[in-house]
């Protein structure tokens, strides 16, 4: 089915309004609901799941240090409309688990562990059933962190890929009042772009595969797939939308909320992006980019200056295929900018060179160095299973950093693909990447480097919480753990990998407790 591109205006998600607000705290309520939305002018309405019945969910905008509480409520149907594989992470408990489980993770949030959205802290409709790690109905987000682009999404055990694909995603923006001095584009010129990919049937329904291609007769049905990319790209819940802009500077907060797909974004007129931030907030200094790679869960904070493009139409393009080349008719396109609106007032916003101060990584303060490898195996059905350090989810915890300590994690990737690795609770700095001989490593376990360590490009010199670990490279990151202790996770953010079984619990310990 061919859908005409750039016929629907880009929706700007509503900002969530608090139920109660005082100097001490702000309280929100959000309900997960089944809903229908018309994703394209020529499509029938699509059944989705959305926060407050919206896809994407409402944007939550908070100030740095604002004490925020959110009651996340599940009002979803008792059965899923996407294919559940009951052979992965099935419950060993005596009580039957509900088919539809949810829990919300604030991605990039520095939050207590009982508000982090631990996969086994799930809850069913009206909290009738809860997972073994469920602790509270109202989550607490202290927002004691830098201004940054965060996002919230489902994180339920073995269901994350399906619940997110169904629509359970939304943006969460922390505003730092100190940013005002930088005079960045603001208000209606500060726009979130939440990018997803889907396959949509002619009747408007979402397609998600119930089995891998050419499945063997022995496979369970439904059966998890190792990856999935839809050929139809949506931004803020619309298929290939357009945005009318003024000939001036705009700030775009770009979030990759896709399950598997990595994008390589550029402007089709050869124009530049000015990157001002990444996952964890502003960069030390702005970076001029002609293109940038955005893996699942990564965020880029960019400025596009349309001043010289009055009257033009510009396509935000993608050159990264998913298991093959991009199709110029489909996934090579993201959205269109139309520089057709008159300038409302003089543009006094800036593209500052220097943005934020950064402490250098103090190598003498490193308390621990961990070597962790990405690995692959097969399950009893012959399906691929990707692992972290050859451990399954339910194996004993092996990563136990102490609160306040700084560690270097050396992540070895001998697999065939790039994996976006996400650590909960912390932001980290990228130290370097170094190529190694995969064949020798697979054969003998010997790490034989084939080139020098390469420091991160300027676009990765800020705070990160999700980072691309490329095939055939050792990635080194430095993280200071805390300020909270408790049970968190780290995982690959390709959701099909995360669900089976590329996710591990992580205990951040406090020796004083």
Curated annotation (Swiss-Prot):
Inhibited by azide. Changing residue 491 to C: Decreases copper content. Strong decrease in catalytic efficiency with both ABTS and SGZ. Changing residue 116 to A: 5-fold decrease in catalytic efficiency with ABTS as substrate. 785-fold decrease in catalytic efficiency with 2,6-DMP as substrate. Changing residue 386 to A: Slight decrease in catalytic efficiency. Shows minimal changes in the structure of the copper centers. Pfam families: Cu-oxidase, Cu-oxidase_2, Cu-oxidase_3. GO terms for molecular function: copper ion binding; oxidoreductase activity. Optimum pH is 7 for SGZ and bilirubin oxidation. Optimum pH is about 4 for ditaurobilirubin oxidation. Optimum pH is below 3.0 for ABTS oxidation. Optimum pH is 8.0 for UB oxidation, whereas optimum pH for DB oxidation is 5.5. The keyword Oxidoreductase applies. Belongs to the multicopper oxidase family. This is Laccase.
């Amino acid at each position: 089915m061919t859908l005409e591109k750039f016929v629907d205006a880009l929706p700007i998600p509503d900002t969530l309004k608090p139920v109660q607000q005082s100097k001490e705290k702000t309280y929100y309520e959000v309900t997960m609901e089944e809903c229908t939305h018309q994703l394209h002018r020529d499509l029938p309405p699509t059944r989705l799941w959305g926060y407050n019945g919206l896809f994407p969910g409402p944007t939550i905008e908070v100030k740095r240090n604002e004490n925020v509480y959110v009651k996340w409520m599940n009002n979803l149907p008792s059965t899923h409309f996407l294919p559940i594989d009951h052979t992965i992470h099935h419950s060993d408990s005596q009580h039957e688990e509900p088919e539809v489980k949810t829990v919300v993770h604030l991605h990039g949030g520095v939050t207590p562990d009982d508000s982090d959205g631990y996969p086994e802290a799930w809850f069913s409709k009206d909290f009738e059933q809860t997972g073994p790690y469920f602790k509270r109905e109202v989550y607490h987000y202290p927002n004691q962190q830098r201004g940054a682009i965060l996002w919230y999404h489902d994180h339920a055990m073995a269901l994350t890929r399906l619940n997110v694909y169904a629509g359970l995603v939304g943006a969460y923006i922390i505003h730092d009042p100190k940013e005002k001095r930088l005079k960045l584009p603001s208000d209606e010129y500060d726009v979130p772009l939440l990018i997803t990919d889907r396959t949509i049937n002619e009747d408007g329904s979402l397609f998600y595969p119930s089995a891998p291609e050419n499945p063997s007769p022995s496979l369970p049905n439904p059966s998890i797939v190792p990856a999935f990319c839809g050929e139809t790209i949506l931004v803020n819940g619309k298929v290939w939308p357009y945005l009318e802009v003024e000939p001036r500077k705009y700030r775009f907060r770009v979030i990759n909320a896709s399950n598997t797909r990595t994008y390589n974004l550029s402007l089709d007129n050869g124009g530049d992006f000015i990157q001002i931030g990444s996952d964890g907030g502003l960069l030390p200094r702005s970076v001029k980019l002609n293109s940038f790679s955005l893996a699942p869960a990564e965020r880029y904070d960019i400025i596009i200056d349309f001043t010289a493009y009055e009257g033009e139409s510009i396509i935000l393009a993608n050159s990264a295929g998913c298991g093959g080349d991009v199709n110029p008719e489909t996934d090579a396109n993201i959205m269109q900018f139309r520089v057709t609106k008159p300038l409302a007032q003089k543009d006094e916003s800036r593209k500052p060179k220097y943005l934020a101060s950064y402490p250098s990584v103090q190598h003498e303060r490193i308390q621990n160095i961990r070597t962790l490898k990405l690995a692959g195996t097969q399950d009893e059905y012959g399906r691929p299973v990707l692992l972290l350090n050859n451990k399954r989810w339910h194996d004993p915890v092996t990563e136990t950093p102490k609160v306040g300590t700084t560690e270097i994690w050396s992540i070895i990737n001998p697999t065939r693909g790039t994996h976006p690795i996400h650590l909960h609770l912390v932001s980290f700095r990228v130290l370097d990447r170094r190529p190694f001989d995969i064949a020798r490593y697979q054969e003998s376990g010997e790490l034989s480097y084939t080139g020098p360590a390469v420091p991160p490009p300027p676009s990765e010199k800020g705070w990160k919480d999700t980072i691309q670990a490329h095939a055939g490279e050792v990635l080194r990151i430095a993280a200071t753990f805390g300020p909270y202790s408790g049970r968190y996770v780290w995982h690959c953010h390709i959701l099909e990998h995360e669900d089976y079984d590329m996710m591990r619990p992580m205990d951040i310990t406090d020796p004083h407790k």
